């Protein structure tokens, strides 16, 4: 089971009713089911903040020391490593609960990017959600190898949902 908590701190998000708990659960489940190591966990939790440029700028400055609005910020609750996800070793403790982390999305930046990239707002949001969940479970793009692995997984998941890959 995946429990999703959504906080909408900006009214423009209400225009996108399709961005809801059901969509977020479906995408999260699709990602987690790809890794056997998550199979013992019975309950996952994920917190989502749908906000504006002013708040994301504050968060970005506070947590990353970058004074600029960004499209999305991911705050993992666990220190996972993507390489462990592919091993048959059980790297998780015996807990049947896992809080994956928190994700904050910025409406204005996502809207502007979707217009510039000629994508629908929803499809761009879904791509950023997939990207963020992958960060929460230990994926990163600090070097070309990691970036390629993460991008290929994003493409695979986006294709599953019928969304053309952005790369």
From Swiss-Prot:
It holds the Pfam family YbeY. The keyword Cell inner membrane does not apply. Gene3D superfamilies: Metalloproteases ('zincins'), catalytic domain (3.40.390.30). Zn(2+) binds at residues 131, 135, 141. This is Endoribonuclease YbeY. It comes from the Bacteria. HAMAP family: Endoribonucl_YbeY (MF_00009). Binds 1 zinc ion. Single strand-specific metallo-endoribonuclease involved in late-stage 70S ribosome quality control and in maturation of the 3' terminus of the 16S rRNA. One of its GO terms (biological process) is rRNA processing. Keywords: Cytoplasm, Endonuclease, Hydrolase, Metal-binding, Nuclease, Ribosome biogenesis, rRNA processing, Zinc. The gene is ybeY. It comes from Rickettsia africae (strain ESF-5). GO terms for molecular function: metalloendopeptidase activity; RNA endonuclease activity; zinc ion binding. Belongs to the endoribonuclease YbeY family. Its cofactor is Zn(2+). Its EC number is 3.1.-.-. GO terms for cellular component: cytoplasm. It is found in: Cytoplasm. Its main location: cytoplasm.
């Amino acid at each position: 089971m995946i429990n999703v908590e959504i906080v909408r701190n900006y009214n423009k998000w209400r225009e996108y009713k399709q961005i809801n708990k059901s969509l977020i659960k479906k995408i999260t489940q699709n990602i987690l089911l790809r890794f056997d190591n998550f199979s013992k966990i019975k309950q996952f939790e994920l917190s989502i903040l749908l906000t504006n440029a002013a708040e994301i700028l504050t968060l970005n400055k506070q947590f990353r020391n970058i004074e600029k609005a960004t499209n999305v910020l991911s705050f993992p609750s666990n220190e996972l490593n993507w390489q462990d996800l592919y091993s048959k070793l059980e790297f998780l403790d015996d807990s049947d609960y896992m809080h994956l982390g928190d994700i904050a999305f910025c409406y204005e930046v996502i809207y502007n990017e979707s217009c510039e990239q000629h994508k629908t707002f929803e499809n761009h949001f879904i791509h950023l959600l997939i990207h963020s969940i992958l960060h929460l479970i230990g994926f990163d793009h600090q070097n070309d190898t990691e970036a390629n692995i993460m991008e290929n997984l994003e493409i695979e998941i986006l294709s599953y949902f019928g969304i053309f890959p952005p790369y």
